[in-house]
């Protein structure tokens, strides 16, 4: 029987968990959704939902982890009533982690590729939009180039995790997240010096009631709800595992609030980098891979010192995606160590092989198998993402929630006692009806909306 590892420091726990929550979505989705939904008002609604919906579910995942000191399946088993079947969700959660990694590794590989391309000067100053955009289509058409960067990312990730919790994940996350927070400030300050900065920031953050009316307040509310929910990657035991490693000195709501604050800081700052830059160069702020790999490189090649700013931006993106990858790798390894009694090295090796094979369809989906259309005409990446984002995250969160607030599960009192252990922000007992009756409806709404 091995003694369970734990984080060396509170800061380590917060930065690892924030690193897991902070990913590509903070940069390629949040700013765009803010702009589309009327700026400042959306941000306020987003914060309301983050506190009212994201934070409670975050504390639930952490509570299950901290009370059980176990990974996904055994965590449920330790807390559920004998004979009940909650732990089956643990398997679904781990499946979700594997599935997320099936495409996230490819996208993270793209970030590293672009960091490298800017670093070596492949993007020349003054390239035309055509040429800058062609770099991405050429990358997608080239399975060898894409595989190389994906494989590098996976091997590096498992190498980090094979070194132990404190010497691997925690140490590297501290360095990467500190660098990420530094980089994002430097990049934002630089964006403020551009000619169209004022206009960009105004569009981004000043509440625009005209847009709100056009979009419809109901749609703005539901967009804010979705963004607040998805930003923390809840529902696949990604946070549960860090709960199982954390200390008991601080309350879960307090620690959760810090994770939410860091996540929101990065999301809002990303917009302060992107909007001024796009407005200064007269390009439309889009979302998704197009924004990151076509629009922004286009901006950088026309910018004074663009090679440096492009390199720094993609270093930031590499850290944002890699911090999520090593956090999820830690989870699937911990699951194998718990369930099958493997040591860390074996867990790293076996999972490295599994993830490398499982990541190939996503790489090939853009070239060799580009005619392949799966769920509703989606390509491989979008199909994998649909299963994770529309089904497993909201579905899993709903199960964690019901487990923590119903008498058939762990029960509200047990959850509350665990969450409120330690100093810091406490959850009021009076919130029980809200947790039991309102929250499940909100999450069910997100689940149904995502599936129709």
Regions found by a protein language model. Name each.
Residues 1-28, 57-62, 66-79, 83-88, ...:
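Membrane-interface "cap" regions at the ends of multi-pass membrane proteins
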Residues 3-7, 170, 174-322, 326, ...:
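Membrane-embedded translocation segments of transport machinery
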Residues 6-17, 42-45, 84-98, 147-153, ...:
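Select transmembrane alpha-helical segments in multipass membrane proteins
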Residues 4, 108-141, 245-249, 254, ...:
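Helix-loop-helix connectors at the membrane interface of multi-pass transporters/channels
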Residues 6, 12-14, 20, 143, ...:
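Loop-to-transmembrane helix boundary motifs in multi-pass membrane proteins
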Residues 12-49, 199, 237-243, 254-257, ...:
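Transmembrane helix-boundary motif of multi-pass solute transporters/channels
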Residues 89-94, 340-352, 383-443:
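C-terminal membrane-solvent junction of multi-pass transporters and transport-like membrane proteins
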Residues 4-5, 33-37, 67-92, 105-166, ...:
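Inter-helical loop and helix-membrane interface segments of multi-pass membrane transporters/permeases
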């Amino acid at each position: 029987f091995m003694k369970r590892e734990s984080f060396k420091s509170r800061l380590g726990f917060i930065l690892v968990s924030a690193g897991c929550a902070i990913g590509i979505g903070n940069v390629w989705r949040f700013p765009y959704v803010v702009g589309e939904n009327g700026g400042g008002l959306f941000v306020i609604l987003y914060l309301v939902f983050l506190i009212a919906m994201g934070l409670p579910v975050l504390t639930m995942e952490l509570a299950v982890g901290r009370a059980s000191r176990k990974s996904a399946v055994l965590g449920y088993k330790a807390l559920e009533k004998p004979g009940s079947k909650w732990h089956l969700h643990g398997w679904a959660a781990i499946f979700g982690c594997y599935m997320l990694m099936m495409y996230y590794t490819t996208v993270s590989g793209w970030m590293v590729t672009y960091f490298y391309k800017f670093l070596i000067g492949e993007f020349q100053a003054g390239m035309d939009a055509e040429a800058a955009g062609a770099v991405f289509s050429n990358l997608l058409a080239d399975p060898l180039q894409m595989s190389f960067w994906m494989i590098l990312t996976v091997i590096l990730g498992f190498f980090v995790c094979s070194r132990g919790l404190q010497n691997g994940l925690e140490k590297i996350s501290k360095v990467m997240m500190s660098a990420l927070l530094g980089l994002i400030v430097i990049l934002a300050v630089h964006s403020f010096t551009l000619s169209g900065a004022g206009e960009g920031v105004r569009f981004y953050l000043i509440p625009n009631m005209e847009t709100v009316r056009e979009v419809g307040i109901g749609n703005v509310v539901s967009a804010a709800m979705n963004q607040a929910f998805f930003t923390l990657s809840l529902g696949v035991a990604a946070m549960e595992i860090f709960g199982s490693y954390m200390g008991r000195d601080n309350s879960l709501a307090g620690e959760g609030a810090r994770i939410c604050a860091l996540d929101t800081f990065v999301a809002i700052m990303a917009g302060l980098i992107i909007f001024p830059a796009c407005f200064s160069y007269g390009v439309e702020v889009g979302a998704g891979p197009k924004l990151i790999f076509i629009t922004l490189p286009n901006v950088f090649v026309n910018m004074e010192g663009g090679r440096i700013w492009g390199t720094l931006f993609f270093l930031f993106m590499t850290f944002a995606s890699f911090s999520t990858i090593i956090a999820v790798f830690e989870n699937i390894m911990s699951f194998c160590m718990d369930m099958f009694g493997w040591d860390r090295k074996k867990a790293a090796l076996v999972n490295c092989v599994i993830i490398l094979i499982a990541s190939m369809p996503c790489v090939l989906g853009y070239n060799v198998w580009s005619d392949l259309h799966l769920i509703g005409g989606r390509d491989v990446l979008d199909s994998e993402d649909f299963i994770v984002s529309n089904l497993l995250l909201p579905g899993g969160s709903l199960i964690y929630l019901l487990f923590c607030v119903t008498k058939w599960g762990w029960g509200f009192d047990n959850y509350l006692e665990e969450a409120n252990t330690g100093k810091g922000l406490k959850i009021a007992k009076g919130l029980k009806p809200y947790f039991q009756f309102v929250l499940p409806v909100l999450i069910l709404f997100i689940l149904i909306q995502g599936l129709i």
